[in-house]
A protein has these predicted regions:
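Mid-domain alpha/beta scaffold segments of enzyme catalytic cores
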Residues: 1-256
């Protein structure tokens, strides 16, 4: 059985067949999934989704949205984090891909700090989004007065950066790009980082595995990620499923 630790099933791309997608997911061998609700417009839609068995949530304010967020949004977020089926805070982090001006970076760091503090207050792990900002993220985390626990979602950094995050206590999220032909750096990371520090994620509807590339991704496709990791690490599918499943349970303690 596999746990998809990062899905966005409230996305509008699933509006026409969400029920079928969820049914396919659990029929394909998925045991649980985490709905990552990091866009404020989807928060309450996610609350409805997690009423279903074996679907849990993470709530946060995505770095791309921090300039739109106001004080009341953080107050709403704090309430959502206390939901019994909320197992993490996120995805939160730094994203310099679209806008790396100082004002935006400062706002992202301020928001990240607020949300890290909320995670600490309610003893939740964090799901970290990091794009074109790995060195800054490492520096930021090291400066915190406490060390958060969590996962670096959809890791795409170097092996050196991967080792630093693992040394800091983080897991690395491995997604569809591990199956792509031009993913040598990521394959090297997976080869050299112990399986006990890896999580499998789809990030659906984004980043479909090579077999389904250029189509909408969905949780049932997660087996393609597991297969690729097994091939890289010369391990059986069962071993990869068993260890990554336990990794998810160890990190997201609210999953039952």
């Amino acid at each position: 059985m596999i746990i998809d630790t990062h899905a966005h099933l409230t996305d509008i791309k699933f509006d026409n067949d969400r029920k079928d997608v969820i049914e396919r997911a659990f029929n394909s061998g998925l045991s649980r999934l985490i709905e990552v609700s990091c866009e404020m417009c989807y928060w309450y839609k996610s609350l409805e989704l997690i009423k279903q068995n074996n679907i849990f949530a993470s709530f946060g304010i995505h770095p791309i949205d921090v300039l739109k967020a106001v004080k009341s949004d953080y107050e709403k977020l704090e309430t959502l984090i206390q939901n019994e089926k909320c197992v993490a805070v996120g995805e939160i982090g730094l994203d310099y891909h679209y806008d790396n001006c100082k004002n935006n970076i400062d706002a992202q760091k301020e928001s990240l700090k607020v949300q890290l503090d909320l995670a600490k207050k309610y003893s939740k792990p964090v799901i970290i989004h990091c794009r074109d900002a790995y060195d800054d993220m490492i520096e930021f985390i090291k400066k915190q007065s406490f060390m958060p626990t969590g996962v670096i979602h959809c890791f795409s950094g170097s092996l050196e950066q991967a080792k630093i995050f693992v040394d800091l206590g983080f897991y690395l999220g491995i997604d569809g790009p591990i199956t792509y032909k031009k993913s040598d750096i990521l394959k090297e990371v997976v080869k050299n980082i112990e399986i006990g520090k890896l999580l499998v994620e789809t990030d659906c509807p984004y980043l479909a595995p090579q077999k389904y590339k250029r189509t909408r991704n969905e949780p049932s496709y997660i087996i393609e990620i597991v297969k690729e990791i097994a091939s890289i690490k010369n391990m059986s599918l069962n071993e990869i499923e068993k260890v990554t499943n336990q990794n998810a349970l160890n990190l997201f303690k609210g999953i039952k």
